[in-house]
Curated annotation (Swiss-Prot):
The gene is rplL. Homodimer. Part of the ribosomal stalk of the 50S ribosomal subunit. Forms a multimeric L10(L12)X complex, where L10 forms an elongated spine to which 2 to 4 L12 dimers bind in a sequential fashion. Binds GTP-bound translation factors. One of its GO terms (biological process) is translation. Belongs to the bacterial ribosomal protein bL12 family. This is Large ribosomal subunit protein bL12. Signal peptide: none annotated. It comes from the Bacteria. The keyword Ribonucleoprotein applies. InterPro entries: Ribosomal_bL12, Ribosomal_bL12_C, Ribosomal_bL12_C/ClpS-like, Ribosomal_bL12_oligo, Ribosomal_bL12_oligo_N_sf. GO terms for cellular component: cytosolic large ribosomal subunit. Forms part of the ribosomal stalk which helps the ribosome interact with GTP-bound translation factors. Is thus essential for accurate translation. Gene3D superfamilies: 3.30.1390.10, Single helix bin. Keywords: Ribonucleoprotein, Ribosomal protein. Pfam families: Ribosomal_L12 (PF00542), Ribosomal_L12_N (PF16320).
Length: 129
């Protein structure tokens, strides 16, 4: 590898998980690609190599994705998103209008389920990944 690629690799190794996640989002936006397909392949490989025991391991981090909402429930969904995320009105409105969109990432199962319940009670459709 060249010195430039070695330097980039070392920089990537020093990123926190949150910073790496933000970098992936920026790359997806800048190049118009999605990292979701390749991530699925990477996740499938360790389970296949490790045998059947690891494949049954329960997921510990979830992304909460607002898939959509009933038009009549937009304000209720907006309020529920604000409560779940702590976002301001403008940011929450932009997030709700951009559905489908993840509004919580890398959260525990309990937090994900609580957010899902609150949004669904307000009239939104939510999935956990």
């Amino acid at each position: 590898m060249s010195a430039k690629t070695d330097e980039i690799l070392e920089s990537l190794k020093s990123l926190s998980l949150l910073e790496a996640s933000e970098l992936v989002k920026q790359i997806e936006e800048a190049f118009g690609v999605s990292a979701a397909a390749s991530a699925g392949v990477v996740m499938a490989a360790p389970g296949a190599a490790g045998g059947g025991g690891e494949a049954a391991e329960e997921k510990t981090e979830f992304d909460v994705i607002l898939e959509g909402f009933e038009a009549s429930a937009k304000i209720k969904v907006l309020k529920a998103v604000r409560e779940a995320t702590g976002l301001g009105l403008g940011d929450a409105k932009a997030l709700v209008e951009a559905a489908p969109k993840a509004f919580k990432e890398g959260v525990s199962k309990e937090d994900a389920e609580a957010a899902k319940k609150a949004i669904e009670e307000a009239g939104g459709k939510v999935t956990l990944k």
